[in-house]
């Protein structure tokens, strides 16, 4: 079972931001616990056929990479991302042939890389990637707030998808440590 730990009740700004992001990240794995491979890839939202548990997990993995690796610390995209010039804007969600366990492991690994990338950076550090060159560099603080919102919003999607699949809702009991 995924360990879900509430963010610290009294922490500095950095601790709060990372704590809330890590909480939302843990919900991604939790929403997929016990799901069959078939259901992880099952399309239940007629108007959003890419919105499967597997598709959302893949989307969040690549958002982690894009915001923290590419944008913040300036790692160039040398073809490792699913996005190509002229390709589908949601290419990262085409994962029908990728096992959910692999997608979740890749997501966890990307989240760990994100945390490593930001470990020594002040919240006012700004992007070194493509947006910086265009004069639109966001701060680490902005990126953390955005990723909390992005991840939480998609966890809500996952909650709805899971409920439609097998009627499971909500969260498990959180550790108060």
Which ranges hold each PLM region?
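Short, contiguous alpha-helical
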Residues: 4-7, 14, 18-33, 37-90, ...
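Active-site rim elements
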Residues: 12-17, 99-101
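Acidic/histidine-rich alpha-helical segments that form the ligand environment
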Residues: 88-131, 139-150
């Amino acid at each position: 079972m995924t360990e879900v730990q509430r963010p610290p009740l009294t922490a500095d700004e950095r601790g709060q931001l990372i704590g809330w992001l890590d909480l939302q990240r843990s919900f991604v794995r939790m929403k997929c616990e016990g799901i069959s491979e078939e259901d992880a890839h099952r399309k239940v939202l007629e108007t959003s056929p890419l919105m499967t548990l597997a598709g959302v997990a893949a989307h969040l993995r690549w958002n982690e990479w894009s915001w923290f690796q590419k944008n913040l610390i300036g790692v160039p995209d040398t073809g490792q991302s699913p996005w190509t010039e002229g390709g589908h804007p949601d290419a990262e969600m085409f994962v029908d042939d990728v096992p959910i366990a692999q997608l979740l492991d890749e997501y966890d690994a990307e989240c760990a890389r994100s945390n490593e990338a930001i470990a020594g950076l002040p919240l006012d550090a700004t992007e070194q990637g493509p947006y910086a060159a265009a004069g639109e560099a966001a701060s680490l603080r902005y990126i953390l707030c955005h990723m909390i919102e992005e991840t939480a919003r998609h966890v809500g999607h996952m909650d709805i998808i899971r409920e439609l699949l097998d009627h499971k809702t909500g969260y498990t009991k959180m550790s108060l440590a």
